[in-house]
Structure formats: C-alpha cells, structure tokens
Amino acid sequence: EQTGVTNHLYSGWNVVGFWDVHQACARDMLLPLGSTWATAIGYDAGTQDYEVSMINGGTGSYSDQRLMFPGKAYWVSMTAERDLICSYYRTYSFCAEWVGDYHGMQIPITWADEEAEGFYNTLDWSSSWTGQFINGDDAAMERHWKDPAFGGMDSNYIDNTHLAFFTGHGWEGGFVFGTAADDYELNYSEARWGNTKTDWIVLASCNVLNESTCTEYWGPAFEGLHSICGFDTVGAAHPDMGWYFADLLMKGKTIWEAWYTTTDRYVFPNDGSLKSAILAADIDGDLSTPDCLDDHIYGYGSSINPPGDPLGFQYETDSCKWEV
C-alpha cells in the first residue's frame, strides 16, 4: 500500500507542487528537507509575478512561517539533494503538564492531576493524535514552556507538539510551577510559541487571559501559534474537565466551543460570575471574520494556519454557567 509521495530534489532550483487540502506555513510544508532548503518562491497568477521569497529561518516579510497554498507551484532552492516526503496519513502530537502540590507556596489544586490526565488519556484514544508526554508536580517545569532565547527548552518539550495543555495556578502575567527549574513562574515575556511546532495551547489557570492585559502580554508569544485558551477571571479545576474537553474536540467542536462548553459545565460556582477566554490569531486584519477562532484540532474539522506575526488578535470570553 502506498502511504505517501516522495519527490527527490536536487541541489539548486526545483519546482514543487503543494499537495495538501489546507494551507500550511513553509516551515511545516518543507520540514522533511531540514536545513537543505534555502529559499521558496511562489508565483501569483493574478499579478503574473513572483511573490516575495520565503527564507529558511527568515523573519518579517521573508519569514518561513508565511503560508503556502494548495494548487500552486513553488520554486525551492536547495543546498544539497534530499527527498521531500509527504505522508497520506498524518498523526499529530500533544502533551500535558499539571501542578497540584506547590509545597506550601500556593494553595494545593486537588484535582489538577485528574483534569490533565483525563485530557491526555482521552485524546490519546484518537487515531490522529499521539501523546508525547505528561508531567505532574515537580516533573512539570517552567523550562518546558520557556523559549530557548530566554534560557528555556520549549523546543524539546511543549513546542515540539501541536497541542499543549496545562493545569495549575496562574495570574495575568503567566503561570506557576512547584519547582524552581528554572523558575517557579513562566512569565509572558519568556514565551515564544509556534516557532517550532505548537499550534494550540490551553492554560487551565486563573486570570491568565485577563481582558485588560492578555493581548499586550501574550500577543508577542504568537510565533506560529493559533490560539490560547484560558480564563479571564479566577477559574477552577474539576476531575471531569479534561476528558470532557478532549471528547468534545474529537466530536468535531471547535477548540473554543469545546473549551467554553467544558468550563460552562464544570467551573463552579457555575453562576456566570467566572469567565473562560480565548486569544486567537487574526490573519486578514478583519476582526469580523473568525479565522483561528474557528479552528478545530487536526483530523476533526478545518483550521487556519496563521503567519508568525499575526496582523491582530481576536479575543472572546464566556460566562461559566451551565444551562440545561
């Protein structure tokens, strides 16, 4: 059985057709080529002119996080021969971390483990998704979420998966761990997510997406990231939140629908006084269109790949109240 397509590319310029049904950034499209690809250039049939180059490791207008589109051909410059392999059957990766025991520095979170493990174990049943790791208490570390530019290792941990889930204490400027490895707190200024792989992050942490600060604080963290789900206000943990959220994702709910439906049901006092939230990348400058706000996880519906530096952000909140 044929499971994929292999194109052998030579040193110099090669023509590559884009095979997928959805757009993808150049970094992801050409990932099998590693460092051997240097430049990719598309042709705009409307203007009958070549587009601005996408450079491996580039930023700004030359960023390798700019999108490549189905039905187009691209010139790809190679520094050495290599095979470009596209599998017909894709699997995606996810991870989870949780902190319940803060060693007296914070109030313990009783159900942190059950919430995160419920999410992890449920999504791991999907044939499209594979769990990479789940860490709890002192094994969950700030360095796993911090960009290497600031001394972290997220490119080996959460940013090496497509979806990352965290349960633990938080505040407007970040979230909190139980061990100082390397710090007790991940500050928003140390996050750069999506520059390796991550598309979606869920932070089951109080106030981390507070309306007054979240775009200013977390906007710079979007380096290919689609969205962050969390809480505008104080939140709450519940043993059924994680599995229920994952189950809704696999039933075809958008990430935002799944998150606010879950928090409506399981965040107490459940009277509408607490609010869940999402911050999502906007790709076209038109905030009346949902863009990444309407993302589904891969394999369960459509999604949109944003550039590394989004034009703007869409922010939504939902009052946590279960209505039968």
What residues fall within each predicted segment?
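Alpha-helical scaffolding within the catalytic cores
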Residues: P148-M153, A180-R192, E211-G219
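Solvent-exposed loop/turn segments at secondary-structure junctions
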Residues: G100-M105, D138-A140, G168-G174, S205-S212, ...
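A short, glycine/acidic-enriched catalytic loop
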Residues: G170-W200, N207
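A domain-level signal for caspase-like cysteine endopeptidase catalytic cores
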Residues: Y89-G170
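Active-site-proximal C-terminal subdomain of hydrolase catalytic domains
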Residues: V208-V324
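Extracellular/periplasmic catalytic domains that process cell-envelope and extracellular macromolecules
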Residues: L67-M68, N156-D159, W193-K197, A221-E223
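N-terminal exported-region signature
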Residues: E1-Y88
